[in-house]
UniProtKB/Swiss-Prot annotation:
Forms a complex with YAE1. Interacts with PYCR1 and PYCR2. It holds the Pfam family Yae1_N. Belongs to the LTO1 family. The modification N-acetylalanine is found at residue 2. InterPro entries: Essential_protein_Yae1_N (IPR019191), LTO1_adapter (IPR052436). Signal peptide: none annotated. The gene is Lto1. GO terms for cellular component: nucleus. This is Protein LTO1 homolog. Keywords: Acetylation, Nucleus. The complex LTO1:YAE1 functions as a target specific adapter that probably recruits apo-ABCE1 to the cytosolic iron-sulfur protein assembly (CIA) complex machinery. May be required for biogenesis of the large ribosomal subunit and initiation of translation. May play a role in the regulation of proline metabolism and ROS production. It is found in: Nucleus. Its main location: nucleus.
Length: 137
């Protein structure tokens, strides 16, 4: 009689056993795919932020050179904003993706960039496209 119960237990418990094995296999495969997908997402997102920051830096350095040559009273305010933007860009943590205030600093840089564009009467249109990124005026 005990042998008959063991046979039926194996049949009855097969569903639970297969469920557990399937869950474990799915969990392992999902974990490895999640790491790959997360890495790919991080690379793409990081490249977009890097492209945006690089564009702001080039814009600020170009205007610094242009404003330096014509150092008038109006240009001194513009020059202060340019230098403030450059300082924000230099302090940006390029090598630390775990930096807690990354998005706050990025928003501050974007705000300073918009302020500079307003002072310069420039309407920027920053776009990241598959062909590259940049500003359009």
């Amino acid at each position: 009689m005990a042998v008959e119960q063991d046979i039926f237990d194996a049949v009855v418990m097969a569903d639970e056993r297969f469920h557990g094995e399937g869950y474990q296999e799915g969990y392992e495969e999902g974990s490895s795919l999640g790491i790959v997908e997360g890495k790919r997402y991080g690379m793409v997102h990081g490249a977009k932020i890097g492209s945006e920051i690089g564009c702001y830096r080039g814009f600020a350095l170009a205007w610094k050179c242009l404003l330096h040559s014509g150092a008038g009273e109006k240009d001194s305010r513009k020059m202060k904003v340019v230098e403030a933007l450059i300082a924000l860009l230099q302090d940006f943590p390029y090598d630390d993706p775990t930096y807690e205030k990354l998005h706050e600093d990025l928003d501050r840089i974007r705000g300073k960039f918009r302020q500079l564009c307003s002072l310069l009467n420039v309407q920027p249109d920053f776009k990241v496209t598959p062909g590259g990124s940049g500003l359009a005026f």
